[in-house]
Amino acid sequence: MATNFLTKIFGSRNDRLLKQYRKTVVHINALEPEYEQMSHEQLRAKTQEFKERVARGESLESILPAAFALVREGSKRIMKMRHFDVQLLGGMALHFGKIAEMRTGEGKTLTATLPVYLNALSGKGVHVVTVNDYLAHRDAQWMGRLYNFLGLTVGINLPNMPRAEKQAAYRADITYGTNNEYGFDYLRDNMVYEAQDRVQQGLNYAIVDEVDSILIDEARTPLIISGQAEDHQALYVTMNQLVPQLVRQEGEADLRTGEGVTRLGDFTLDEKSHQVFLTEQGHETAERIFASHGLIAEGASVYDPANIALMHHLYAALRARHLYHRDQHYVVQNDEIVIVDEFTGRLMSGRRWSEGLHQAVEAKEGVTIQAENQTLASITFQNYFRLYHKLAGMTGTADTEAYEFQEIYGLETMVIPPNRPSRRNDQLDLVYKTTREKYAAAVMDIRACHERGQPVLVGTTSIENSEIIDQLLSQEGLPHQVLNAKQHAREADIVAQAGRAGMITIATNMAGRGTDIVLGGNVEKDVAAIEADTALSEAERAARISALRAQWQIEHEKVKALGGLRIIATERHESRRIDNQLRGRSGRQGDPGSSRFYLGLDDALMRIFAGERVKAIMDRLKMPDGEAIEAGIVTRSIESAQRKVEARNFDIRKQLLEYDDVANDQRKVIYQQRNEILDASDLSDLIAAMREDCMTDLVRQYVPAESMEEQWDLPTLEKRLASEWQLTMALQELVQGANAITDDEILDRVRQAAKAAFDAKVEQVGRENFTQFERMVLLQNFDTQWRDHLSALDYLRQGIHLRGYAQKQPKQEYKREAFELFRQLIDRVKNEVTKLLMTVQVQSPTQLEQAAQDMESRAESIANVTYTAPTDTGQVEATLAAQMAERPLPQGMRVGRNDRCPCGSGKKYKHCHGKLA
């Protein structure tokens, strides 16, 4: 009450902003006579003048009045349309990063030209975001004439365009495209292996058309790129046939004396950590076997750059054969390997071991080897659009969602007054007892309108409901057209003609958005056809166009006299905003119009929220069948129900965003690191830091900091340095031959040895050649580990709500454990990259260059790539649902904290999946 009282005295914030902006409108209007006197060339020259002023540091706000006046004048000359004052207000709201709510027919597309032109002067790019490809193409061509006239370039970003064309589109001053395509381009740019392959030029300023549809309706579902990595099915089978030729070594060897081995062999097993290590003899045996089967060249090493991937498959095959046993670790069911939880004995259907182990077990058992489909990259619209330096949006219906726009995106909603006051009559809802009665009443209304010639738009909430109306109208013999929001270009033509006298058009709520319904029909397409007809003389063209427009004026006045466009809806949507969008199709630019909702007590929304209450009223009034209840209290109770649903949906979206923000922070780190690697000319400092960290982590496992010599485990350290890092060091001899040596000196010796071995490789082929190889190794490892990390996060997210039963806050638990998973990801990248670079054997620059190219082509050879995007309703189409690759996470709790983790990572359980338990 007090708030309303103060608003009446001081005005709302919306009123105060409009008052402030109207002062600028006066300034813009004052410039109009001056710009009218300028020639075309003088107008174009203004653009260059503005660009130079911005480049010198002048703010866009200081140029705004002159720039808006220039665009208005250009539009008058090229488009034959003059911006209304309210469109100038809308343009200012968009420039200042707000959401402009402008009713249907108020000219949002033309309004956007003002801030688009102004912000394009900075040279940093402007992205105009539309809901479908048709609108992107239409608006780019339509408004592109104006931008080109003013000296700016325009690009269109469409799906399946060649990379060069996309790059050209993004290099333009202004780029038009769909929300999905901008998001997918961002993800693809963070999957490239060459800096010059990126298409986007930065995220400066975006104007989102139909902002409510994109940032709210489609915000529940992320954009997902998924696919299958390179197909190695034949290689898994071959490795399974070769590993029986390798013999297990028995006994533990002393690295100094060689004693302790009871039988020499090719590999040793560490059953506790589920790891396999090749011996020196094993490397020679593997090289001989690979050469005999044509997998490597005669005399080549398994650690040559081109052959390094073979070792990955060999280790997977050895682990599958010797460490994973049927009916203990897995069972075979229906031609599939199903993992057994070794603590509970339960089958873990749908889970798959990672790093090629599952495929190796499939090859061992002779079942079909399944190519694993993984999420390669993913982002929500909420997090993508928040990456822009400045974001704005426009729609006909945003005020009902103003709180969500402010809360999630930090966007203020500003209601722009119409150019002419609305004359639409929004009638009270009619509520019937049954659906049958509801449809019968709606059809009677449609027939009455058709008989008097009044055009009707029938709105439905689903394709199923539109088909019911279609059948009923066909039975009545009423001619009509049906739209279902799939064929955007055709729909735009039909919707444009829905205002003709006697027309009946059935449309789902989303169909034909972005196209005005003009009373009497739209003649612009016919006018364009006449203008394009070269067979006609100039005079004939003018005469035909004049006759066409005169005929349209007669039709227009006729339909206005009949009451304008009639909106008939057969169900309330769960969002008031969608209902308002439907109503907004009628009564554009001060035209007459009317709307009515026909409801049944068994409609979903009524049944759940308001059915019992309204039914009780009907029963008390003893209303006969076929009679409707029409009362303000009913309409208000329905709107109250809609508010409840909207609040619930907002809570869902906000909760999803809070979880996704965790992944988003990690995504930013990974993508930033990836871009730095792509752009860096020298990676030696990064690699050196990673190598030192790895050596420190390894040494500190066996030679703890500030520890006594008696606590050191030098034999195991020597063994691991030799088998995993190809570093042979006599650390025990060093200690025995020295009077006193500290743990830090041991660490320094290992670091120096690792640096010397690494520098020798670099010197052999040259720093420049080795840098490109380092880049490929880093990028490939980042991508592989990030894909596995996305799967791990998805698995963590699925079960995190159960923590609530343990009196823990699931959201906080998710943040904590996701951070730990991310730390492990960074550690794995560090270890894998360093290990590969330390063990690879290079002979020549040519060999290294070829290896880098092979790695790049392998990394990019993703099969069955699927692009999953939200549909118009914010739901994922079932046919495009991503099949997430999943990591093995044991669910038992009886493993010892200091035992090796059963997942096979080699880490202690408390440092690995024990953190997830």
Swiss-Prot record:
Residues binding Zn(2+), per UniProt: C901, C903, C912, H913
GO terms for biological process, alphabetical: intracellular protein transmembrane transport; protein import; protein targeting; protein transport by the Sec complex
Cofactor or coenzyme needed: Zn(2+)
GO cellular component, one term: cytosol
Origin superkingdom: Bacteria
The protein's Enzyme Commission number: 7.4.2.8
Catalytic activity: ATP + H2O + cellular proteinSide 1 = ADP + phosphate + cellular proteinSide 2
Recorded GO MF terms: ATP binding; metal ion binding; protein-exporting ATPase activity
InterPro entries noted in UniProt: Helicase_ATP-bd (IPR014001), Helicase_C-like (IPR001650), P-loop_NTPase (IPR027417), SEC_C_motif (IPR004027), SecA (IPR000185), SecA_CS (IPR020937), SecA_DEAD (IPR011115), SecA_motor_DEAD (IPR014018)
Entry protein name: Protein translocase subunit SecA
